Amino acid sequence: MKTSQLFYKTSKNANKEASVLSYELLEKAGYIFKTAKGIYTYTPLFWRVALKMMDIIREELNAIGGQELVLPILHPAELWQKTGRWEAFRSEGLLYTVKDREDKEFCLAPTHEEIVSMFVSQWLSGRKQLPIHLYQIATKFRDEIRPRFGLMRAKEFLMEDSYTFSDSPEQMNEQYAKLRQAYQNIFDRLEIQYVIVEADGGKIGKGKSEEFHVLSSLGEDTLCVSGHYGANIEAAVAQPPQYTYDKDYLPIEEVDTPDVRTIENLQDFFSVPPYRIMKTLVVKLSYGEKEKFTAIGIRGDRQINLTKIGSKLNADACSLASDEEIQKHLGVEKGFIGPLNCPIDFYADETTQCMTNFICAGNVKDKHYKNVNWDRDIPRPEYADFLLAEAGDLCPTNNHAPYEIFEGVEVAHIFNLGTRYTEGFDVVFQDEQGKPQSCWMGTYGIGIGRTLAACIEQLADDRGIVWPKAIAPFDISILYNGGDTACEEAAEKIYKELQGYGYAPLLDDRNERLGFKLKDSDLIGIPYKLILGKTFLNSGMLEIESRSIEKFSVEPKDFVHWCKRHLPSPRVFSPIP
């Protein structure tokens, strides 16, 4: 393509609203246009990049037997009500809903488990059809409370989502492994640094779940990594430092503690380390339109993990209760909540099991108790892992080596769903005995916009975007001083030659000076620049400069050979098997 034909616009100045580098550069280089908060127009330049990434996705998924389809974006409410996710998503305000002229409710799809399950249930004729792998690349919607960071957290976004249906847990795991490897192949071809970590399934499902993260200081997710093992902090199982507690029980004491509310206050007041204090927090659990308040006990030196609590207690959502809610449901101020005489359900983190002679509140203002013990003073609660992992905690999966903490941008997520959706939608087959059995389902997704933004966050430099070669909008830009007839004629000849070999060059034919064109090419992120300037006019040699400032001097007769060595192979869209 020629620049004079390309509908695009670059800008010298950054958008003041662009709070992150990827958002700034995508707007500055003419890849996106903000239509409204969290809603963007994908420009022709952006779509060239997106199509190349989609082509890579299609190649890898078709290679493992994936079949592409297009599912509806508008979903009847009853499908989501059948799985309970209508209430779960609406309770967090994430679901866009509409009504038609017959007053029937629909939602704009944030995900497609329900509708693909209904489809397969109607078409599946027998076990011999299994496993099935269906995928689509489509627009999805989430009414984000705080849309921000450009494509990182938008209200409307582009995703690839895959769904597999199998006849057994073993076959489901085989499909999971195939999709996992296909996703690895996709990100390997993008040549970016990423990690795969264990994750919480959230509202999608409770089975095996992993996330793909591009490492970035922008990352909204915190990752715990130990050797080759990693986990999202929401799901990380960790062994915190262990401490020795008294063997003999001391008499329990009630102590006046006027206005002593925090762990730090208690440490100073009782002259004890924080791990000898039982901290109790109140969480609000949402179950559809219903709410429940529960108390969680944890060592005073640690923090609770709301995701683990919500998962353990099968809640749709979990958050810390407000001061007003605590006062209403417990009749006591924040800071004096404890397991003694607790008027609501009480659970405790498993690291508190060995605590003896600990200090805790008793749900009375300005009072605490010391030398409190399980069984004698408080019935033992149900224990579970409610711990938020920290750097230095030991990783039980990696021979108890310590965790390091990194930040990452989640770009893909894979799940084993089991039979949660297939049972509800009667996605069944007949086994050897002729009995109906529910299929075992998996779901997988890649955020295309998030991945492209994450590439920019990781690879960009002070001159602009640095796209991976495999997805750059053009393979090479051809640049010369506007008005230089000799260079213009040579550029036109090279441009046609490259097109003839199937490459995607961008010929900058604007009547602008060479320096201006060089800056635009770097900003846009084209991997190579072919520069026709003084060197070419004096010696006939072609100057080529990579985006990383690697320079080449090539004779015109060797240029095609150079292209075959350095440019991506001429691309065609992947054939459908």
Swiss-Prot record:
Entries under InterPro entries matching the protein: aa-tRNA-synt_IIb, aa-tRNA-synth_II, aa-tRNA-synth_II/BPL/LPL, Anticodon-bd, Anticodon-bd_dom_sf, Pro-tRNA-ligase_IIa, Pro-tRNA-synth_IIa_bac-type, Pro-tRNA-Synthase_IIa_type1
Subcellular location: Cytoplasm
Free-text function comment from the UniProt entry: Catalyzes the attachment of proline to tRNA(Pro) in a two-step reaction: proline is first activated by ATP to form Pro-AMP and then transferred to the acceptor end of tRNA(Pro). As ProRS can inadvertently accommodate and process non-cognate amino acids such as alanine and cysteine, to avoid such errors it has two additional distinct editing activities against alanine. One activity is designated as 'pretransfer' editing and involves the tRNA(Pro)-independent hydrolysis of activated Ala-AMP.
Keywords: Aminoacyl-tRNA synthetase, ATP-binding, Cytoplasm, Ligase, Nucleotide-binding, Protein biosynthesis
HAMAP family referenced in this protein's UniProt entry, alphabetically: Pro_tRNA_synth_type1
PROSITE patterns registered for this protein in UniProt: AA_TRNA_LIGASE_II
Gene3D superfamilies: Anticodon-binding domain, Bira Bifunctional Protein, Domain 2, YbaK/aminoacyl-tRNA synthetase-associated domain
EC annotation from Swiss-Prot or TrEMBL: 6.1.1.15
Broad class of enzyme this protein falls into: ligase
PANTHER family documented for this protein: MITOCHONDRIAL RIBOSOME PROTEIN L39/PROLYL-TRNA LIGASE FAMILY MEMBER, PROLINE--TRNA LIGASE
GO cellular component term, pick one: cytosol
Gene Ontology biological process terms, A to Z: prolyl-tRNA aminoacylation
Any one Gene Ontology molecular-function term assigned to this protein's record: proline-tRNA ligase activity
Ligase listed as a keyword: yes
Location (main, coarse): cytoplasm
Catalytic activity, as annotated: tRNA(Pro) + L-proline + ATP = L-prolyl-tRNA(Pro) + AMP + diphosphate
Family: Belongs to the class-II aminoacyl-tRNA synthetase family. ProS type 1 subfamily.
This protein's domain notes: Consists of three domains: the N-terminal catalytic domain, the editing domain and the C-terminal anticodon-binding domain.
Highest rank taxon of the organism: Bacteria
Name used for this protein in its record: Proline--tRNA ligase
Quaternary state and interactors: Homodimer.
